[in-house]
Regions:
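Basic, low-complexity terminal or inter-domain segments flanking catalytic cores
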Residues: 72, 105, 144, 191-192, ...
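Metal- or metallocofactor-binding catalytic centers and their adjacent structured scaffolds
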Residues: 138-173, 347-353, 360, 465, ...
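Short acidic, hydrophobic short linear motifs in intrinsically disordered regions
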Residues: 158-162, 169-184, 207-212, 366-378, ...
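Conserved short loop/turn motifs at secondary-structure junctions
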Residues: 1-4, 80-84, 163-172, 182-187, ...
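Phosphate-backbone binding and catalysis cores of DNA-processing enzymes
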Residues: 1-165, 255-308, 314-318, 474, ...
Length: 638
């Protein structure tokens, strides 16, 4: 009675083999929820072990082992020891490396967004503000100034009003992927955390099996949802519906992730378990609720002195439907629909009085770095991996230090604002912080170098279509359409010679090494590369009479972007700051970042301090702070 998926089927088969069971008295039962009724029903419907599912799992496991066992030694020889490669993890790293390069190559373009405030009488005759925006952006400051000047003394009138009904349909119940994404966005859980909590909920009998790519709900679940909706909100909110699974190569016909009993709106458990259960319950209930009914009004405002038009949009919820229970979140704020406010009463031809008209310089946005949730979504879109592989893949690439999850401080940027008020155009410059990122996935230098090496020598393994087509072949094995051994043989016969050829290639420079120039004083070559403890800089070569000098790179510096000047700065460390308590105080950079060294004690530098600029007084303060902390720790222990 192991889990109802390929891994579960393989476990059942291994038990059958190891225990030497007989086919005539061994039956397999499956259920996707741990409830009395589900288990009794499964016992009434036993079946044999599905050898096709077992073979599909064997094929995946063996193919992934072949890739790992064959590629990892190549990386040890060509890049650095102790590295590993894997079919899914390498493709995930490639996505992150490519996105990083897109970001660095991105050139932001400026344009002016023009907004206006119009003063309109409401039903009581009181003037209220109505915000409107120019239908398109203006490219240059000169054109924006010309437009605002044209608005001086112009007449504004309502040219057209269109009102149309809108419907919003609820999202489908959760699959593994959508649960991981929504739990990250709404609850801040990592992908691995979500799966761990969901596993506990499943084992406690609160939810159905949590590794699934199906959006189907059983009849039992739809009836349970209907009853719960009627009881809580009334008949009008019910709309039973069936969702189609759209995922590429969706696996066996599981059910979506849902509560086992829809009448249980809450459960006993930890705070995290309660939050995740609440999310699953709301999503499931919402999927069986009526559409939200809205009314969208678009008002077009003409300008007597220009062919341009302003547009004001109002959206009113006429019937909340599923929105009463659930609103879906988005990775990118731009994906969210603009929920505008209610517009005042208006009529075609109505003359309008304007308040300030503002042209604000805005910039095109670079592609965002992946979060764990958006990476899962991308892998699913490409048909790479399966519900059981998303979380382990994302954990592996971080554990291997090919990718790190981190925050990025924003940068200050100046932007221009032109304001037409009281027939005068005011020109001002403002500053804003842009590009702040939290919990995003960044490629490390090691990840980038490994990715480039594998992309050059093993393009098939890193190819998105190839990886997705392998998943399709596993599906065909599961359906009994192809032999698993023939797929493995075909793959190995093509893959193994590539490994042999790559090992035989001799290269002049170490993989990932970048020559930046020469040291001015000695003329020796200056390079950066991946060393045993990560990215490092080097002056000189092993062939020189004098040993080469090495320096650890600072956190935030990258092999791809570091300059010769920045590398030469690194060799000014360690530097002596002076003496404290009769002992030398120096500052340097080690494998864990910048440090102060005093009397054989290392003190890490805070992120805000630059090792090139720290003073002796500041270093003394850090030494004293560390001593105080150590003393407090010893007191607490005693």
């Amino acid at each position: 009675a192991s889990d109802e998926d390929r891994e579960g089927e393989a476990i059942a088969w291994h038990l059958y083999e190891v225990l030497k069971l007989k086919p005539e008295n061994t039956k397999r039962i499956v259920f996707h929820e741990i409830t009395k009724s589900a288990i009794l029903k499964a016992i009434e419907q036993p079946r044999d072990i599905d050898i096709n599912l077992v073979n599909a799992q064997q094929a995946r496991r063996i193919l992934d082992r072949i890739v790992g066992f064959e590629l990892s030694p190549v990386l040890w020889r060509k890049v650095k020891p102790a590295l590993s490669a894997g079919r899914l993890q390498s493709v995930a790293v490639r996505l992150i490396v490519e996105r990083e390069r897109e970001i660095h190559a991105f050139k932001s373009e400026a344009a002016y967004r023009v907004t206006a405030v119009f003063l309109v009488p409401d039903t009581d005759g009181k003037l209220v503000e109505m915000k409107a925006e120019l239908a398109h952006r203006i490219k240059t400051k000169k054109e924006a100034e010309a437009f605002l000047n044209a608005c001086k003394g112009a007449n504004f009138a309502i040219e057209d009003i269109t009102t149309r009904p809108l419907k919003k349909t609820p999202p489908a119940p959760f699959t593994t992927s959508t649960l991981q994404q929504e739990a990250a966005r709404k609850l801040g859980y990592t992908v691995a955390q979500t799966m761990m909590i969901a596993q506990r909920l499943y084992e406690s009998g609160f939810i159905t099996y949590m590794r699934t790519d199906s959006v189907n709900l059983s009849e039992f679940a739809t009836i349970g949802s209907k009853d719960a909706i009627i009881k809580m909100m009334g008949e009008r909110y019910v709309h039973p519906r069936h969702f189609e699974t759209k995922t590429k190569g969706a696996q066996e016909a599981h059910e979506a992730i849902r509560p086992t009993y829809m009448e249980n709106q809450s459960i006993e458990g930890t705070a995290q378990e309660k939050k995740l259960y609440d999310l699953i319950w709301k999503r499931t209930i919402a999927s069986q609720m009526a559409d939200a009914e809205l009314e969208k009004t678009t008002v077009t405002i003409s300008i007597s002195s220009s062919s341009e038009v302003f547009t004001a949009i109002g959206e009113v919820i006429k019937f909340d439907g599923f929105l009463r229970v659930y609103r879906e979140s988005y990775d990118d704020e731009n994906e969210q629909e603009d929920e505008s406010n209610l517009l005042p009463p208006l009529k075609k031809g109505q003359k309008l009085e304007h308040g300030p008209i503002v042209a604000t310089e805005r910039f095109t946005q670079r592609p965002p770095r992946y979060t764990e949730a958006s990476l899962v979504r991308k892998l699913e879109e490409l048909g790479i991996g399966r519900p059981s592989t998303y979380a382990p893949t994302i954990s592996t690439i971080q554990n291997r230090e090919y990718v790190e999850k981190g925050n990025k401080d924003g940068e200050e940027r100046m932007f221009n604002v032109l304001t037409l008020k009281d027939q005068q155009v005011k020109d001002e410059n403002h500053t804003e912080i842009t590009g702040t990122e939290k919990a995003k996935l960044f490629p490390t230098d090691t990840g980038t170098v490994v990715n480039d090496f594998l992309t050059e020598y093993f393009p098939d393994i890193l190819d998105y279509n190839f990886t997705a087509s392998v998943e399709k072949e596993f599906d065909e094995i599961a359906e009994g359409e192809v032999k698993w051994t023939s797929i493995l043989k075909t793959f190995y016969d093509q893959f193994h010679p590539s490994v042999e050829n790559t090992l035989a290639i001799k290269t002049e420079h170490k993989v990932g090494e970048r020559i930046l120039g020469e040291e001015p004083e000695t003329g020796k070559p200056v390079s950066v590369k991946i060393g045993r403890f990560g990215p490092m800089a080097q002056i000189g070569t092993a062939e020189d009479e004098e040993k080469p000098r090495f320096a650890q790179m600072k956190k935030g510096q990258s092999i791809e972007t570091i300059t010769l000047e920045e590398v030469l700065e690194l060799f000014k460390l360690p530097r002596t700051l002076g003496e404290y308590e009769g002992k030398t105080v120096s500052v340097g950079i080690g494998r864990f970042g910048p440090y102060v060294l005093h009397n054989k004690v290392y003190v890490s530098l805070p992120k805000t301090m630059d090792p090139m600029e720290i003073t002796l007084e500041e270093a003394e303060q850090l030494i004293l702070e560390k001593r105080t902390k150590e003393a407090e720790r010893h007191i607490r222990v005693q």
